[in-house]
């Protein structure tokens, strides 16, 4: 289960929509022998809905696609028309309400120079804002990786994120992450790989960005890459998931580590 449809229903239609969707959610998932959750946050939401047999297994990241050597800051600065002293904050994703892109925009406005927010895909249809640059949606993940790696930090303000795969992709690119201390992102991001804002609020978020840049962001970025490699590379994640499948089927040899790599 990689989403919280009840929370999304409440966000878009009001709190009245939460319970009916939650009941439908529980009715569906209670039919399964195992329910796999990508985070403790979603596991708790499942338990609240009356679902059991929950196992937490995170998603994985393509560490060969998202990697630090795609970084080309001079190329990106030239594309954006910015000077070398600019501090580039990147967000890539859908322009959905739950992403709290407005919090990112307001935070950058509060910070002022030299910060700039680069929205990849998420700025579609939004009015022009000072210090906010919208880039089109990129289908090629390598193109996304190049942009993320070429920025200084990745920003993500969704406080109800089930997991946050794009956050892992930014970490794999060697970029520190500024998140919110809520939802699935808070289980991945800590001070070793970034900074967490107390709330999804422009003031708190701006403070978190400043706190990150007061530290050694390159060292933090290297730690982020190391964590992505050691804990979230797909060969490791896939092996753990297949062990769960093997336990369910009674086949302890469901997959071997070398096979997990080959299948991926």
Feature map (PLM): residue ranges:
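Membrane-proximal helix-turn-helix segments that form the acceptor-binding/catalytic region
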Residues: 18-34
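Carbohydrate-associated surface elements
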Residues: 41, 60
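Conserved donor-binding/catalytic core segment of Leloir-type glycosyltransferases
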Residues: 83-99, 105-108
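Conserved acidic donor-binding segment of nucleotide-sugar-dependent glycosyltransferases
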Residues: 137, 191-202, 211-216
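Aromatic "clamp/platform" in nucleotide-sugar-dependent glycosyltransferases that forms part
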Residues: 159
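Short hydrophobic beta-strand element within catalytic cores of glycosyltransferases
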Residues: 176-179
């Amino acid at each position: 289960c990689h989403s919280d449809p009840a929370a999304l229903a409440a966000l878009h239609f009001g709190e009245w929509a939460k319970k009916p969707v939650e009941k439908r959610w529980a009715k569906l998932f209670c039919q399964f022998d195992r329910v796999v959750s990508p985070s403790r946050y979603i596991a708790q939401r499942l338990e609240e809905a009356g679902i059991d047999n929950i196992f937490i297994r995170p998603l994985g990241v393509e560490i060969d696609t998202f990697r630090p050597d795609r970084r080309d800051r001079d190329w990106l600065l030239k594309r954006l028309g910015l000077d070398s002293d600019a501090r580039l904050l990147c967000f890539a994703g859908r322009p959905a309400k739950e992403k709290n892109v407005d919090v990112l925009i307001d935070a950058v406005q509060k910070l002022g120079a030299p910060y700039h927010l680069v929205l990849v895909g998420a700025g579609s249809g939004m009015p022009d804002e000072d210090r906010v640059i919208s880039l089109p949606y990129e289908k090629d993940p390598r193109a996304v990786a190049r942009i993320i790696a070429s920025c200084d930090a990745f920003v993500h303000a969704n406080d109800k994120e089930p997991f946050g795969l794009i956050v892992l992709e930014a970490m794999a690119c060697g970029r520190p992450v500024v998140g919110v201390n809520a939802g699935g992102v808070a289980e991945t991001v800590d001070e070793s790989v970034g900074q967490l804002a107390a709330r999804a609020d422009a003031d708190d978020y701006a403070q978190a960005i400043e706190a990150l840049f007061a530290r050694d962001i390159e060292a933090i970025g290297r730690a982020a890459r190391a964590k992505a490699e050691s804990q979230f590379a797909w060969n490791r994640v896939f092996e753990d998931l297949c062990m769960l499948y093997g336990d369910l089927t009674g086949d302890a040899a469901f997959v071997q580590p070398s096979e997990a790599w080959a299948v991926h």
